[in-house]
Amino acid sequence: MGNFKIHSKFKPTGDQPKAIETILKSIKKGNEFQTLLGVTGSGKTFTMANIIEKLQRPTLILAHNKTLAAQLCSEFKEFFPENIVEYFVSYYDYYQPEAYVPQTDTFIEKDASINDEIDKLRHSATSALFERRDVIIVASVSCIYGLGNPDEYKKLTISLRKGMQKERDEIIKKLIEIQYERNDIDFSRGTFRVRGDLLDIIPSSTSSKGIRIEFFGDEIDRIREFDVLTGTILGERNHVLIFPASHFATSKETVERSLGEIENELENRLRELNSQEKLLEAQRLRQRTNFDIEMIREMGYCSGIENYSRILDGRAPGTPPKTLIDYFPEDFLLFIDESHVTLPQVRAMYAGDRSRKNTLVDYGFRLPCAYDNRPLKFEEFEKKINQVMFVSATPAQYELEHSQSIAEQVIRPTGLLDPEIIIKPVKGQIDDLYTEIQETISRGYRILITTLTKRMAEDLTKYMIELGVKATYMHSDIDTIERMKIIRDLRLGEYDVLVGINLLREGLDIPEVALVAILDADKEGFLRSETSLIQTIGRAARNSESKVIMYADNITKSMKKAISETERRRKIQTEYNEEHGIIPQTINKEVRDLIEATKVAEESTEYGIEATKSLTKKEVKKLIKEYTEEMMLAAKNLQFERAAQLRDEIEELKGKE
């Protein structure tokens, strides 16, 4: 177990030292809330890393989507190579929760596709928290959903030591109890195999390393770690902890106690439904719940066992579920990145879940205890916070009102200024925009255009293409993987212009962009609020030659505030640069895609389907094998966009076999 130690050729500069000192002082005073108000490109992540290093506490970093969580995880892994940095997001590639539509009498069964790689990372995250303190977990908002009870999880962990008196069969029984499966043929994560006096286990938190227990009679003679693929022995271990294969694993005693309580709740609910003459609902509930009870009794779990988690945990009705936060020690540190977006997400989670559960309970598909398999309410989330730092370029009212300390980070280490803002009339905006686009392209840069509607984005893109501009659009109908591809292609120069709506705000760091155009900037509303405008302006803050054009006939209150704030920052930045002799430099970004180190703008796709047209069947098979290996490696390194791209290419190649 080590201490947090940053590895970086950079030292805090500009506003960073002062911001670090201000936040540290506030946290050490015992203040619960603090805010880092940092402009785009000011090195907020590096400031966070320095605070973690100084405080030496287990840390949870909350991001508002998987993509930004992966980006942050990648950056913190680079800052802390000697420490544990984990990634905890929803493990569903696809998720359709169970639901009932009374109007059409349609019940939709739960349907989900679980990403095994992400499930492994989730187990790796929770097990790390039980083993050491130098742990950073970067999570999406899904971490406020119910997870298994950490006390039960810890209690079920199997501790094995060299020289321990332990029968082999006793360990096997315990492994089955914590949901490991015996499989002597397809040996994979969460399974074990037995060969004479050898017991091989692949823990739930890894797929590449196994644990070999060697017995001499009833004594553990040797514990060794081995490579699952090659069988090579990697080293000797004196002690090993085997964590449960599921976060919802429960002991036999807990299961036996819980079954009686589930049966009691069923009887009470059936009486209630029968008294309301809901006979069909009562019959349905009896049938479904009895099936679950039998499955739990025989197998120790059932499909949808999380709906009984309140009873399994021994919690009172209405009490908050156990979540990832409960796996942290009490003195943990919480960072909420892009807090102006993340906190509203946390607030909205509970209401959406409750409305769906109401229908399921009312119509006899679930017992009322299903209500307590839910995300945290916002006030419950607040109570679980120890000390938190909100991180945003545009903190909302909640952050500003609650924070006992606010540190501002306006100076960028690169000396870059906030962009110049030009206001132009709406009349003739498209023709003027075309002229600006041509001028920007001639300098080798890219353009972002933000519109108010999806239709306008599509029409404008179509018009630009007709004029010979390499343009594309991006809006909410485009999934994450396609979004990554579009951004990569923009950076590679496949496109010069990207048109979008509100997706052009947080997390789009493209140094090649030298022009951001905001159409209909004077139309008040969510997409043209002060916060939205400042975030959109920030997209141009990565290039020393960039500017922002607002097309508007009137200057709205939001525009005035956004322009005033940008000018204030420019003044501070200019004075600092003049005082220290700094010349603004465009960010030379070692390009990661929005997720971990998928080298984008410096190299186009290593392989292309076009190049495979002349291959023989044997060569195609060989290429599929190579792609598959690379895809697994990319997924392991959190390069999910690259993995998805390879997956698509494998599918196309299979069509050529």
Swiss-Prot record:
Annotated UVR domain residues: 621-656
Keyword annotations from UniProtKB, A to Z: ATP-binding, Cytoplasm, DNA damage, DNA excision, DNA repair, Excision nuclease, Helicase, Hydrolase, Nucleotide-binding, SOS response
Coarse class of the protein's main subcellular location: cytoplasm
Any GO BP: nucleotide-excision repair
GO molecular function: ATP binding; ATP hydrolysis activity; DNA binding; excinuclease ABC activity; helicase activity
CDD domains per the UniProt record, alphabetical: DEXHc_UvrB, SF2_C_UvrB
Domain Helicase C-terminal: 429-595
InterPro entries hit by this protein: Helicase/UvrB_N, Helicase_ATP-bd, Helicase_C-like, P-loop_NTPase, UVR_dom, UVR_dom_sf, UvrB, UvrB_inter
Entries under PROSITE patterns matching the protein: HELICASE_ATP_BIND_1 (PS51192), HELICASE_CTER (PS51194), UVR (PS50151)
GO cellular component: cytoplasm; excinuclease repair complex
Top-level taxon of the source organism: Bacteria
Family membership noted in the UniProt record: Belongs to the UvrB family.
PANTHER family recorded: UVRABC SYSTEM PROTEIN B (PTHR24029:SF0)
Record-linked HAMAP family: UvrB
Name of the molecule in the record: UvrABC system protein B
Encoding gene (name): uvrB
